A protein has these predicted regions:
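Eukaryote-skewed repeat-based solenoidal scaffolds used as protein-protein interaction platforms
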Residues: 47-50, 56-190
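N-terminal alpha-helical scaffold/docking segments in eukaryotic complex subunits
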Residues: 1-55, 194-262
Length: 262
């Protein structure tokens, strides 16, 4: 059985070499420059197939996708966390995948949301999606998740988020802050480096990283206040674990750049 270029095949109908070949083709197409191949074809198929794969197959897929974090092609790098997020949502995660992701995420310099030729790139948003998925996966240390989100926000950049990347990062942070095992101190400790960075501000144009961070924290304040829903589920809205402390911490941090607040 051979899959069409549109991935109309059902992975459950494949066994042996044809199944392995189909997964090999999927991995290769997930780095394709053509968005019709990468996004509309391979990624949509990956999202459909991943829950149906054997656990060992998901691990092999994750191992191969993680290599994409050092790929010279930006679209390969930026789609890697999106695929890993789907693997995490299917219930699997390997600790070996963390370091490649954590090294890439704050270091990625191409933060364009959409490119006319390459289609969606969305590095900041896709990385946030993986953080959000990990926040709901057992055994994750909340502090390293928040620390990585902060590292991405504070990394120097001239790119102003223009495709709701701030919303996606805020959502990821809200999911992390919703973990029941999160201690009260850790619920706000991650704000300390942001406050320090804000205090380095000088008169003149607001740096892109600062504007991106301000907007992320403002959306997070809304989510912490109103609650959040888990995307792609029918679960009711839930709140962050230490709501009052988080709201107070966010307000105090934002007041550094908005001294006119009450």
């Amino acid at each position: 059985m051979h899959l069409s270029p549109r991935y109309d095949g059902d992975i459950r109908a494949l066994t042996g070499a044809p199944r392995a070949d189909a997964l090999d083709a999927l991995v290769e197409d997930l780095r394709a420059a053509d968005p019709a191949v990468r996004d509309d074809g391979a990624y949509v198929t990956a999202a459909r197939w991943i829950p149906m794969l054997e656990r060992a197959e998901r691990h092999r897929l994750g191992d191969r996708i993680t290599v994409h974090f050092t790929d010279p092609a930006v679209q390969a790098r930026t789609f890697a966390p999106l695929v890993l997020a789907r693997i995490v949502e299917a219930g699997d995660w390997r600790e070996a995948w963390w370091s490649p992701f954590a090294e890439w995420y704050p270091a990625e310099r191409d933060l364009r949301g959409h490119d006319a030729e390459l289609g969606w790139l969305h590095a900041a948003a896709h990385g946030a999606d993986l953080l959000a998925a990990l926040a709901r996966h057992p055994g994750q240390e909340p502090s390293r998740l928040t620390d990585l989100a902060v590292a991405r926000l504070l990394a120097p950049t001239a790119h102003l988020f223009d495709a709701q990347e701030d919303d996606r990062l805020a959502y990821a942070l809200a999911q992390i802050l919703s973990r029941p095992d999160l201690g009260a101190e850790k619920a706000t400790a991650w704000l300390v480096p942001i406050e320090k960075a804000f205090r380095t501000g000088e008169p003149g144009p607001v740096p892109a990283w600062a504007s991106n961070t301000m907007r992320t924290l403002r959306m997070l304040y809304l989510l912490a206040d109103r609650g959040l829903r888990t995307r792609n589920t029918d679960e009711p809205a839930h709140g962050v674990t230490h709501r009052e402390a988080v709201l107070e911490g966010l307000a105090a941090t934002l007041a550094v750049v908005a001294p006119y607040t009450g």
